[in-house]
């Protein structure tokens, strides 16, 4: 059994270069998660299970003042280099499908990406949080759950 809760997309910066979770698009995040899943599958027993706890985010709620690494597609926080660097923000630009204030759907995008890569999507479990972290939003309800996927 493997149980993990990877860094959620665009929600935390742990201060490590090349860290997972600071990809410039949801698609790049899912692509990297699928690559991680391939490595997990390689070391998991044939009858083993993979439990994935993952939360969501909203388009437009990403980091500001970051630089896009053109080679890796990752966001680099706290860049102290040239002021000519392209200033980008995760979830603040335009997207073909996702609009400002849309829930990005990272949990399901991730689960379906892993399924497309050969994992069996066995179950989705709602982790209900009776005392969630308060949010300062006025146009939607406070998020009070995360997903756990059994793969």
Sequence positions of predicted segments:
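Core catalytic lobe of class I
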Residues: 1-151
């Amino acid at each position: 059994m493997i149980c993990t809760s990877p860094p959620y997309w665009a929600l935390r910066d742990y201060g490590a270069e090349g860290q997972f979770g600071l990809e410039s698009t949801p698609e790049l995040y899912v692509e990297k998660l699928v690559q991680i899943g391939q490595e997990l599958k390689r070391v998991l027993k044939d009858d083993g299970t993979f439990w994935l706890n993952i939360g969501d985010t909203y388009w437009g709620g990403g980091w500001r003042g970051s630089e896009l690494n053109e080679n890796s597609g990752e966001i680099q926080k706290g860049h102290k280099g040239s002021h000519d660097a392209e200033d980008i923000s995760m979830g603040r630009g335009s997207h073909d499908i996702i609009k400002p204030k849309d829930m990005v759907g990272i949990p399901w995008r991730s689960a379906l990406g892993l399924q497309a890569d050969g994992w069996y999507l066995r179950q989705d479990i709602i982790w209900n949080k009776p005392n969630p972290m308060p949010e300062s939003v006025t146009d939607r309800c406070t998020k009070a759950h995360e997903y756990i996927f059994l793969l």
